[in-house]
Amino acid sequence: MRMCTPIRGLLMALAVMFGTAMAFAPIPRITWEHREVHLVQFHEPDIYNYSALLLSEDKDTLYIGAREAVFAVNALNISEKQHEVYWKVSEDKKAKCAEKGKSKQTECLNYIRVLQPLSATSLYVCGTNAFQPACDHLNLTSFKFLGKNEDGKGRCPFDPAHSYTSVMVDGELYSGTSYNFLGSEPIISRNSSHSPLRTEYAIPWLNEPSFVFADVIRKSPDSPDGEDDRVYFFFTEVSVEYEFVFRVLIPRIARVCKGDQGGLRTLQKKWTSFLKARLICSRPDSGLVFNVLRDVFVLRSPGLKVPVFYALFTPQLNNVGLSAVCAYNLSTAEEVFSHGKYMQSTTVEQSHTKWVRYNGPVPKPRPGACIDSEARAANYTSSLNLPDKTLQFVKDHPLMDDSVTPIDNRPRLIKKDVNYTQIVVDRTQALDGTVYDVMFVSTDRGALHKAISLEHAVHIIEETQLFQDFEPVQTLLLSSKKGNRFVYAGSNSGVVQAPLAFCGKHGTCEDCVLARDPYCAWSPPTATCVALHQTESPSRGLIQEMSGDASVCPDKSKGSYRQHFFKHGGTAELKCSQKSNLARVFWKFQNGVLKAESPKYGLMGRKNLLIFNLSEGDSGVYQCLSEERVKNKTVFQVVAKHVLEVKVVPKPVVAPTLSVVQTEGSRIATKVLVASTQGSSPPTPAVQATSSGAITLPPKPAPTGTSCEPKIVINTVPQLHSEKTMYLKSSDNRLLMSLFLFFFVLFLCLFFYNCYKGYLPRQCLKFRSALLIGKKKPKSDFCDREQSLKETLVEPGSFSQQNGEHPKPALDTGYETEQDTITSKVPTDREDSQRIDDLSARDKPFDVKCELKFADSDADGD
């Protein structure tokens, strides 16, 4: 049952995922929006999918492979384009691609997938080429393709959506991709003119892999074993060890030797050194297993004896958005391949296990091993000399039983509610000599996280929004040139260049120290936070404390403050610009902490203070403070200081002259001057109102008279309106006028429509008839009306004689006889009108006075 441990961990992850995810929530201390920081961008119109990046630090040039185009830009400022070349697909190839069921607009194009250095003057470029992959050489001097038109099969995928990876080693391309149109035949190959090699087309070798990364590890110059260079491939594939109803994904690391030449009889033109092992990235205490590999970065540093590779994972059942980063020593992987146990295929009834550990004898030389000094001593100078027994064993046993475990047996970083896509790592040294591995991890929302490990805990220094449209980052590239350190990120819409740190954005020593950024230090002489990798001045006098102890900062002198004047009864908003997401902001007034629950105060955006219904007691000094926990210590910092003064408007005096002043706005200063009207002395201005408009309105001069009775004069000052208020009132007037015009036009339309149809009272119809009396009667209308009268009018006398009742107008029943029609007399207009009036007077249906009578005939005039 030991072999079922990965599956048991995977199933356990489902049960504990929601319970443990809450613990994996490191929050970025600072979040930089796209507009807040200086980012350099590169984008060409109608060009998309900037997924291939290659940096030449010697030439300070960044090569960008996109859809049907390759660009060369200045690596120090990628907005400066140096060269460009286009590689488009012919219309004939597009048509053939479309005939195979592919999209002519999105798939039948040339997506650049391989961009590798071939020599000092040329690049090796491969593209999908409308599902006919092709490769060519790009001359860097003329920046033109040489027209090689090599077959890209096995070097570049057919489908731009399929996974791929490649690395150029001494002029030979090592690639992992699909070998056919359908993408059903995966392959890891070496494209060489003298010794091309590939993997065996068998499920034990590669089972539906998703290729992620490839890199070469050079042999140590002082190695006594005379070992060979090794090329490592990283991918995720469907498990061959276990078989369930659902597919179980396993992250793998595979290795081949650079000096491999294939077998003589067995494994001809196939790898004889291909071995693969499982990568472990899990949280043992919670049972979480991260088994989908997303990206890998190999960290090389002068201080590292053995390279360290960082791998980015997500769980297969990622229903809560978990991502993890694990670090591995390359020596651990080499130990598994050199001395680990093999696995063999077996058939166990009623068991999900399909491969078990092989405990039998292992032939010599060791299967899958590179040719070293020991093999040469046994007269095996090449893989062509290896015995068939060794080659057959490695053909049947490509999978190792031992797994590659991470450093410290735990992930370096676990983050929930985010899907990481790419990773690069930089090793830097702080002022105290401590070395830190700074991880730059991109997300599927276009953001970049910068994180470090501090005493068995991860600290996300900052989050930077690289792309405004929140699109996924497809590739990351890190420059290592001293003095000019940048991160390059490629997406579907363009490339962004970002510095390693935004030290200058920290305005105080406390902010610079609390950031705990190994790239940043505080400079007391200049009172700025400087970037260590960009300064050439000595580090003496700089302040950096990776523990976050802000007490090392010098005591600040009396801090600056902002003074505000508000009107009595108004509302004040005091701003506090605290960027730290880890800090708690609170306000103090007169050495007392304000409570946001009070109806007097409120918080806007969790930082800005709102004070309602201002009074004299609200005048004073307000301080915004931040409280941040760092290593079980609480750091307090004064972020902002405001001095508030509430202006009290004195009540106007009503003897002998009453001045009433009405003001609007929260910030306004007023002066009220009282003038007496004794005798005939001239009056003085009663009111002076000063505001942004500086409005002064004196009262009208009072008429002189002989009466001694005091007169009460009320001088009303017009209200002072702010521009916003006047704009709103103007908008309201325009709105009312628009509504009035709309309903007026609607009324006219309805009126004329009813007038035309005749649906109006008798007075209106008579007026309409009077207007139309002079018009010529249409002949057809008269004939129709004459025929209608013939059919509907009968003699009232005959009708009453037959029934003994009051006569009623005869209805058109459709049974009129020819005799009735012949004997009918065509009445005149006057007779028609008289007869209709008599009929309507005698018979009013439902006792309703019908005012609409033969509206169509009114146009002819009464």
From Swiss-Prot:
Q: In which tissues is it expressed?
A: Strongly expressed in skeletal muscle, peripheral blood lymphocytes, spleen, and thymus and also expressed at lower levels in testes, brain, kidney, small intestine, prostate, heart, placenta, lung and pancreas, but not in colon and liver.
Q: Which GO terms describe its molecular function?
A: chemorepellent activity; identical protein binding; neuropilin binding; receptor ligand activity; semaphorin receptor binding; signaling receptor activity; signaling receptor binding; transmembrane signaling receptor activity
Provide ranges: composition bias, Basic and acidic residues. 827-837
- Report the superkingdom from the record: Eukaryota
Q: Which residues form the signal peptide?
A: 1-21
SUPFAM superfamilies, sorted? Immunoglobulin (SSF48726), Plexin repeat (SSF103575), Sema domain (SSF101912)
Sequence similarity: Belongs to the semaphorin family.
Cite the residue spans of the region called Disordered: 794-837
Q: Does the keyword Metal-binding apply?
A: no
Q: Which UniProt keywords apply?
A: Cell membrane, Developmental protein, Differentiation, Disulfide bond, Glycoprotein, Immunoglobulin domain, Membrane, Neurogenesis, Phosphoprotein, Receptor, Signal, Transmembrane, Transmembrane helix
Q: Which residues lie on this side of the membrane: Extracellular?
A: 22-734
Name of the protein in its database record: Semaphorin-4D
| PROSITE patterns reported in the protein's UniProt record | IG_LIKE (PS50835), SEMA (PS51004)
Q: What is the effect of changing K395E?
A: Strongly reduces PLXNB1 binding
According to its UniProt record, where is this protein mainly located?
Answer: membrane
Give residue ranges for domain PSI: 502-551
In the UniProt record, what gene is named as encoding this protein?
Answer: SEMA4D
Q: Ranges for the Sema domain?
A: 22-500
The residues covered by the Ig-like C2-type domain are 554-636
Compartments in which it is found: Cell membrane
List the record's Gene Ontology CC terms alphabetically.
centrosome; ciliary basal body; extracellular space; GABA-ergic synapse; intracellular membrane-bounded organelle; nucleoplasm; plasma membrane; postsynaptic membrane
Q: What does this protein do?
A: Cell surface receptor for PLXNB1 and PLXNB2 that plays an important role in cell-cell signaling. Regulates GABAergic synapse development. Promotes the development of inhibitory synapses in a PLXNB1-dependent manner. Modulates the complexity and arborization of developing neurites in hippocampal neurons by activating PLXNB1 and interaction with PLXNB1 mediates activation of RHOA. Promotes the migration of cerebellar granule cells. Plays a role in the immune system; induces B-cells to aggregate and improves their viability (in vitro).
